[in-house]
Amino acid sequence: QMCIRDRLSGGQQQRTALARILAGRPRILMLDEPFSALDSYLREAVESEVGSLLAGFDGTALLVTHNRDEAYRLCPEMMVLDSGRVLRSGHTRDVFADPRSITAARLTGCKNILPCTRLDAHTVHLTGWDVPLQLALPVPEGCTAVGIRAHDFVPCDAGAPNALPVAALSSSENPFDWNLICTAPDGTARLWWKVSKSTLSSPAPVPPHFLCAAPESIMPLTN
């Protein structure tokens, strides 16, 4: 169908641009924030099409994005950059599971960066809670913090491994989950807990007295 460019929707413009690029049979394809100008519905539709395109592309594709979810869904390999420096690279799932540095953890969306001191190869002392945490990953000598993703916390009893006593500070509601900010008992440290409404369906969620994270979910981080 023939259309004047100005009459194309955002999604149609993106599809047209991709078609023009692919017509030249490139060996390298660079996509710089390809979905940033689209609304959420179009973004998901176009992203799905681009994912199918990349799966069949016989060449090298480079996606530049600030959206961690796009990178996770579309890229088998990723590189985390900050001010022109490579902070972490490797298989995408490995980078998310073990970002290694505080900056890389933040760029992959980790909300809980908790200061700590190293005790041994798999144990840290968590500042603010005055408790030890057990980690599955090796703790490097220069470890100054641990990263715990907000959805990796679960309610637990006082004696559970890696149990952290918490008190409620604030909460906010999303369509399908809750964001809760909790503090250490003395209020000197805080953490984010993201929990689905299927777990906490109350209109005014109250966090438990203790939250914990599995050793496999705790990431040792350096500066």
Region spans (language model):
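ABC ATPase nucleotide-binding domains
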Residues: 1, 5-103
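Glycine-centered flexibility sites
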Residues: 10-11, 84, 90, 109, ...
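Residues located in well-ordered beta-strands
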Residues: 91, 103, 117, 165-167
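C-terminal boundary and immediately downstream tail of ABC-type ATPase nucleotide-binding domains
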Residues: 97-120, 147
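Non-catalytic connector elements of ABC transporters
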Residues: 111, 122-223
